[in-house]
């Protein structure tokens, strides 16, 4: 197998992952590039248990049984690896947005299975996003998803803090969007408590003092960050036909992730390999019904 997995082209990747055995071998090489290492005792020899759909590797020293998918978004799933890899490859491309209907058609699974796969991936992305605070010169503002100046349906307007890190040359190096609460929604003002909560949670302590506009009606509509939020709203509406408050944060995190990966990864294949590793862990996602679907 090719040694440098992060330099794979799309064509080579499809050729490499042509069946389940090839996908299993690929995942093994990603997990243990220099050969098996027991995650419990670091012993380097194992016997293979091949009676399951995916093999287990039992350490010859401590008898711990290691799985290839543990800690990844594929953990606990009955969906074939080849279908998972196809989904992850599409999501690894920065400008390729998929909804469940489109994914179900691409990998030939039910809508329910496609939705649960995407949900597990988005949940992992969201946790990864929460673990990466903004650094440096951080600026932000209060925006509203679903806002319309003359709309009577205030409950459909979801307040979101939109913030980004600014590089010395003025460009955006990282974007973050987090839902928030307003003490008095009609006033469209972010409270000091919520303002500080965002900073404490999502801005690195080593950063400069963040500048966040707490007053929605004082925002200039030509502001670059405000225009970025409008692009996100269009993406949500055009790709997913609108998102309710229950899952909105996951989709906001996905958009920010897509925006930020251009600074984090050199290629789609590098990101694809990262998707397959436990860094994007889903082991603590407690969704029994979804695990049965995916």
Model-derived features with residue positions:
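Residue-level recognition of single "structural anchor" positions
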Residues: 1-294
């Amino acid at each position: 197998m090719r040694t440098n997995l992060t330099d794979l082209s799309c064509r080579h990747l499809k050729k490499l992952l042509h069946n389940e055995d090839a996908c299993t071998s690929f995942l093994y090489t990603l997990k243990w590039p220099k050969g098996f290492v027991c995650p419990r005792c670091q012993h380097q020899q194992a016997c293979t248990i091949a009676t399951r759909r995916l093999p287990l590797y039992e350490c010859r020293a401590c008898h711990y049984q290691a799985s290839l998918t543990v800690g990844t978004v594929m953990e606990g799933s009955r969906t074939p690896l080849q279908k998972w890899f196809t989904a992850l490859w599409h999501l690894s491309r920065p400008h390729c947005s998929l909804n469940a209907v489109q994914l179900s058609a691409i990998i030939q699974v039910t809508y329910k299975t496609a939705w649960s796969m995407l949900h597990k991936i988005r949940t992992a992305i969201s946790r990864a996003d929460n673990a990466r605070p903004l650094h440096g010169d951080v600026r932000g503002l209060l925006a509203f998803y679903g806002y319309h100046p003359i709309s009577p349906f205030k409950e459909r307007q979801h307040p979101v803090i939109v913030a980004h890190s600014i590089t010395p040359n003025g460009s955006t190096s990282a974007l973050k969007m987090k839902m928030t609460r307003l003490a008095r929604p009609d006033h469209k003002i972010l409270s000091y408590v919520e303002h500080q909560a965002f900073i404490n949670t999502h801005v690195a302590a080593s950063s400069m003092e963040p500048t966040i506009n707490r007053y929605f009606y004082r925002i200039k509509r030509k502001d670059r960050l405000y225009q970025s939020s409008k692009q996100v709203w269009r993406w949500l509406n055009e790709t997913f036909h609108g998102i309710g408050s229950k899952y909105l944060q996951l989709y906001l995190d996905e958009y920010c992730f897509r925006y930020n990966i251009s600074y984090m990864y050199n290629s789609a294949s590098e990101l694809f390999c990262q998707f397959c590793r436990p860094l994007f862990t889903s082991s603590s996602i407690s969704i029994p019904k979804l695990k049965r679907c995916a």
